[in-house]
Amino acid sequence: MKKLKVIVCGSTFGQLYLKALRSSPEKFQLIGILGTGSDRTLRCAEEYNIKVYKSIDEVPDDIDLACVAVRTAAFGGNGTEIALQLLEKGINVIQEHPSHPKDMEMCYRVARKKRLVYHIGNLYPHLGDVQRFIKCAKYLNNEDRLLYVDTVFSSQVSYPLIKILQLAMPSIQGWEPQKHVEGGKVFQVMNGRLGGIPICMQMNNEVVPRDANNYMHLLHKITFFYTGGHLTLEDTFGPVIWHPRMFIPIQTALAGTLNIRFPDNVYQNTGYILSNRNQNKTFEHILTAVWPEAILQDLYH
C-alpha cells in the first residue's frame, strides 16, 4: 500500500497532527510543516526531523495530503486562505474546525473542480466515551423511545456536537427552531425540534480573541431522556451515566411501614457509570495520547 505524503500546516494544534501521523508510519510519510518560521515551528521540525516550508510555493507538488490546523477566517486567521491555495495546488486538504459555512463552500467548490478531497477534521466522534455514549444511545433508541434531548456546549465545538447528535439520534433531519432565550453573556439558549425530537441547546458563546482555544466552560454535555430513564455524556471525556427513572409503586406508600420487601425496581442503583472507571482523565493524557489517537482515527476515515 502506498504511503500518503503529508504536511501539517500550523504548529499549535498542528503538534497533535504531527504526533498522530508519526504514530502510523505504515500509512503516512510525514514530509514537512508549513508555518511562519517561528521558534515553535522550528522546534517541531527538529523533533520530527522534517522540513519547514514558509510559503505554499515551497511545498512540493507531490504532497498527497495537507492537514491545515490554522485558525480559519471565522476566527481572524488565514487557515481558509491556506486551504484554498493548497487545493488550487492540487493537494487534498483536511482542515480543523471551526470554519464558516461560506468558507467551507468555497473550499468544497475548488476541491470538486480539482477532483480532490476536502474534509473538515472532527476528532470528537472518535473519543472513547463519545463512542460509548453513541453506542448506548443507539441501543436505547431500539429498546425505548427518545423523548427529549438536552445539550450544553461551547460554540467552538458546535460542529462536532451536530455530528455526535447525527450518530446518536434516530434522525436529525428537520430543524424547527421554536424559541431563543438570551442567557446573558455566558450562555445562550435555543429550543426547537431536531428530527422531530424536542431539544434544548445551551451554548457557551464566549471566545477570548487572544486565546480562542481556552477559557471555555466545557466542551460538551449531552443528555437523552427516555421513557425508562436518561443517558448522559457528562463531559466530552466522560463519564457516560445511565440514570433509571425513579418509580415507587403507590402500594409501597400505602403499606404503613418501610420494613417491607420492595418491588425489584426499587433496588436498582440511582445511576450506573458505563465508562471505564480506571481511565486516565488528566489533561496531560488527553493532550498527549487521547487527542492524537482520535485524530489518527479521523484520518483513517
Language-model features: locations:
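Hydrophobic beta-strand scaffold residues
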Residues: L30, V52, V93, V117-Y118
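Beta-loop-alpha module in the N-terminal Rossmann-like domain of NAD(P)-dependent dehydrogenases
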Residues: Y48-V110
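Contiguous beta-strand/loop segments that form the cofactor/metal-binding neighborhood of enzyme cores
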Residues: Y159-I273, K281-E284, W291-P292, L296-Y300
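C-terminal helix-rich "cap/oligomerization" subdomain common to oxidoreductases
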Residues: K3, A45, L65-V70, L116, ...
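A contiguous active-site-proximal alpha/beta segment in oxidoreductase catalytic domains
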Residues: I94, H100-I164
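Short glycine-rich anion-binding loops that position phosphate/pyrophosphate groups of nucleotides
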Residues: R71-A73, L123, E206
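N-terminal Rossmann-like dinucleotide-binding module
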Residues: M1-Y48
